[in-house]
Amino acid sequence: MLFTVKTLKGYKLDAIDGDVGRVKEFYFDDRHWTVRYLVADTGCWLPGRQVLISPYALGSINKDIYQQQIGIILTKKQIQDSPSLNSDMPVSRQFEESYYGYYSWPRYWSGTYSWGSHPYIERDHEKWEKFNQDEKTWDAHLRSTHAGTGYHIQANDGGIGHVEDFIIDDETWAIRYLMVNTRNFWPGKAVLISPQWIERVSWGERKVFVNLSRETIKHSPQYTEEFLLTRDFEAELHQYYHRQGYWLDELVAK
């Protein structure tokens, strides 16, 4: 299922033995555009720490208006005893090695796919040891969804709007779309751009470049936050841009 980051922000986080806080934001890598960590706001519990939860530990998402919670398949003690990272420190590879080693999870940077040896999160523990061996590793540069909000979208013939939100797939934790607000050009219009269609990102300039014209983007299927993102809508969107759906690519990869 697809969720926006803004929808998930503030959701309660339920560990196996109790509440650990609420969703603050997400960190994603800029190679595969996949969420690597949920950042928890733990209030007075574990002050001064960045409490990071990998998608390996994320369970079901309850969207019920009276619940709005995400299950975490960890105990509070496991989280408390995990490698600590100060709230003002970046997430280094050294920290990630310690973090993933502590939980004995497969390292996502060991392999060619978004989750190492697979394009999805492998839940079979018996296969994990195999995943941590021998595959080519790569450096991940983690970005914040909070910091990425507001980045300007540059078409091949000028500016077109800014990033309003990120849309996440809770099965693979891939960022499927950037929600682009174009109200400065066409009042009330919001459109979706897939990270697969991005030419490059200038993190210093806070700009996302796409090899599409403003006119092409202008006439793309309109997205509204209230609209349920169905596969039919996604198919229409990909067909408009003459692109193959990611779900077909992943079907082949499996």
Whereabouts are the PLM-identified features?
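Peripheral interaction segments used for macromolecular assembly
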Residues: 1-254
